A protein has these predicted regions:
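Peripheral docking tails and interdomain loops at the edges
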Residues: 97, 106-145, 149-157, 246-314, ...
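Short glycine-cluster motifs
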Residues: 153-208, 254-255, 300-377, 381-384, ...
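Rossmann-fold NAD(P) dinucleotide-binding segment
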Residues: 66-70, 83-106, 392-399
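ATP-grasp fold ATP-binding core
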Residues: 303-306, 471-495, 504-529, 533, ...
Length: 690
């Protein structure tokens, strides 16, 4: 292990712990933390209470400061008012205490003064290389070392799920809920303000933690977007990462000036980043742990889904959910159908209904037969509490068959099923109570499996002279910028007079398109500053009309002329855009283009740089993909050319961080083999709009 990993290992497996702010007063944070540590068992050699007001607490000698303690201290837990924390951190540095949990609140979360105090904390940590969890956090738990360094009252069971939470209150609620649900954890970390240690530090540690099979996270933001994606990609090679992210709506977000800016926001950036990094996203506490529990025992489904039920209604619910989720309700092999026939079922095709009067053995036999089918990758076993069913016996069937093929039990009911449910939990098998929950959990497995296939593909690189391009960017030669990256554009020229417009049009050939060039006029079509299918006789008049309209909208000095462009007729219109996200960098968008992009909002998002798979997925994820693929006898569009533009534009956005927003709209794509053209574009850089 690296030095950082060794330090974090000591954080989770300390031999000696000091509680700064320990107190005999019941209900106080320092009292609860000390009690929890004392109740942790024999894992700790020494526990030190630190508080200058007392001589003894909980039978322990109480020290006035860390400096008075003889011997090593592996971990200090600080629970005192915020203003006293910097002084204690200096004591930690003097005593060689590398790992610190700052429970104390009153830092950046309370405003300006707290932010200054947190800056001081960070400065001390950097100067002395301290690992600090928090501040403003619940603490940490390592169930496999019997360590509970939190002020929570509930101790979770041991398990293989690590849980990182940015909210201490959320973590407390989850721990309490998990105790009732019998969900076990390996490690729990309340991240707090993430002043020093953030989610990435713990993800890197948990990647190598033998006690952890799955990482579940509750996040409000990420510290460094690109680093977060890089770390999660590495972790998710072997361990699923399930994230519940709060704030995933954009109500009240301000409209930005470009099409992309008005649609894209942090929600889209997070969702794109999660998909690209291999994260399985959950939208509720229930999903967070349903998905985590399922992924802790199933990470691949080798085939379609089978349903075996003793009740038609729940079976139909499961079948509907499977279709809606994009999973496959598999067709059985002929041999399976023949084996099922003697059981006299309501039906012997998928989903199998063994009927409400079926015995447990009949249900178990059907399960066993289906499990032998080569087309079946997982089975959803649904049981309602009918009179003939013995749930404990049914649970034994599930456990036996699960050893050969994944079985997802849906034992529906309350008190009647609880004995069997508890026994299943002891063997690491969760019950889902609701067929839809079971299907969603299998979809999470499939999503994880699919993302494993492509999450590690490196982005392609195109050779471009960026030095020359920067000079063109300075002179606002935007089309030249696209051209340099190999992005196809129509022939064009910039005209400052009507005669120049005619000369350019003669060279290009007719008809032509003509558009105003002004940083103040963004949506040119809306204000009549675009002329299409212009023939030779109309070039000069079109020039004058465009200029007149433009001068009504802005000053003459802000009009740079008129763009005269080869007229590209036909094709289907799409848009490629970019907005630079403050967490993740360039957020790319693809969708249905033209003037209706904001009406239909048929778009998909990814973070640059894109891999080939990312680019293809962006196109496939929009509803209009069927149109691009060809419908009602229409030829398929040249999707490969759009993939090429996405990849080249992705590299452009990465290499030019001063471009804040961009729209390539419309892009006209033609039938397969005939390519595409960027007909119009807009870019907003740190210094200009063009």
């Amino acid at each position: 292990m690296s030095t950082k990993e060794e330090m974090l290992d000591k954080l989770f497996n300390p031999r000696t712990v000091a509680v700064v702010g320990a107190t005999p007063k019941e209900g106080k944070v320092g009292n609860t933390i000390l009690k929890n540590l004392l109740a942790s068992g024999t894992g700790l050699l020494s526990i030190y209470a630190v508080n200058p007001r007392y001589d003894r607490i909980q039978g322990l000698k109480c020290y006035p400061s860390l400096s008075e303690i003889q011997g090593d201290i592996d971990l200090a837990v600080i629970a005192i008012p915020a203003e006293g924390v910097p002084n204690v951190l200096e004591q930690c540095a003097e005593r060689g205490v590398e790992n610190v949990v700052v429970i104390s609140a009153g830092f950046k979360e309370v405003g300006r003064e707290g932010a200054v105090l947190e800056s001081e904390l960070i400065k001390i940590a950097k100067e002395h290389k301290l690992n600090i969890v928090g501040p403003n956090c619940l603490g940490i738990i390592n169930t496999h070392a019997n360590l509970n360094a939190t002020f929570g009252k509930t101790v979770p069971d041991k398990g293989s799920i690590a849980f990182l939470s940015q909210s201490g209150a959320f973590a407390l609620a989850v721990i309490d809920w998990a105790k009732v649900a019998r969900v076990g954890f390996s490690k729990i970390v309340s991240l707090g303000n993430k002043a020093v240690l953030d989610e990435c530090h713990f993800l890197e540690y948990l990647d190598k933690d033998p006690d952890t099979a799955v990482v579940a996270m509750y996040l409000e933001d990420v510290s460094e977007g690109s680093r977060f994606m890089r770390v999660v990609r590495e972790v998710s090679r072997t361990k699923p990462v399930v994230v519940m992210k709060s704030g995933m709506t954009e109500a009240g977000a301000k409209a930005a000036s470009s099409h992309t800016g008005s649609i894209a926001g942090s929600v889209e950036a997070y969702r794109a980043a999660f998909a690209q990094a291999g994260i399985v996203e959950a939208t509720s506490i229930q999903e967070l742990f349903d998905f985590s529990l399922t992924l802790s025992r199933i990470q691949r489904i080798k085939g379609g889904i089978a349903i075996v039920t003793n009740s038609g209604g729940p079976g139909v619910m499961a079948a509907d959910a499977i279709e809606e989720s994009g999973l496959e309700l598999t067709a059985f092999e002929r041999e399976t159908m023949e084996k099922l026939h003697p059981l006299q079922l309501a039906n012997s095709y998928n989903p199998i209904d063994v009927r409400g009067d079926a015995t447990t053995d009949k249900f178990g036999t059907a399960l066993s037969i289906v499990a032998e089918d080569g087309y079946v990758g997982a089975i959803i076993a649904i049981l309602s509490p009918t009179a003939p069913i013995e749930f404990d016996k049914a649970g034994n069937y599930v456990m036996a068959i699960n050893a050969k093929k994944p079985v997802i039990p849906v034992f529906m009911g309350g008190e009647t099923v609880m004995s069997a449910v508890e026994e299943l939990k002891k063997h690491g098998i969760a019950n889902y109570f609701d067929p839809v929950r079971a299907v969603k959990s299998l979809k999470a497995v499939k999503d994880y499996e699919e993302r494993q296939k492509r999450v590690f593909e490196p982005p392609p690189h195109f050779n471009v002279d960026t030095g020359q391009i920067r000079e063109q960017l300075r002179h606002k030669l935007g089309f030249e910028l696209l051209k340099a990256y190999g992005i196809p554009i129509p022939a064009y020229g910039k005209a400052e007079t009507a005669d120049e417009a005619l000369d350019i049009a003669d060279k290009i050939g007719y008809p032509v398109a003509m558009k105003i060039l002004s940083p103040d006029i963004i949506h040119k079509t809306d204000v009549g500053c675009v002329k299409l299918n212009v023939n030779r006789e109309a070039v000069k008049e079109s020039f004058f009309e465009i200029m007149r309209r433009g001068e009504k909208l802005t000053t003459a000095r802000r009009i740079e002329g008129v763009l005269v462009q080869q007229m590209i007729a036909g094709g289907k219109e799409v848009i490629i855009g970019m907005k630079r996200d403050r967490h993740f960098g360039p957020l790319l968008m693809f969708g249905l283009g033209g003037i209706y992009v904001e009406v239909f909002r048929d778009v998909s998002f990814r973070i640059a740089p894109l891999s080939m798979s990312d680019a293809k997925e962006m196109i496939k994820n929009v509803r209009a993909y069927r149109i691009l693929h060809g419908v009602r006898g229409e030829p398929m569009s040249d999707i490969d050319s759009l993939v090429n533009v996405l990849l080249r534009f992705s590299q452009l956005c990465v290499e030019f961080p001063d471009i804040l927003e961009a729209d390539l709209n419309p892009i006209k794509v033609f039938e397969y083999g005939k390519g595409c053209y960027v007909v119009d574009f807009k870019m907003i850089s740190t210094n200009s709009v063009f």
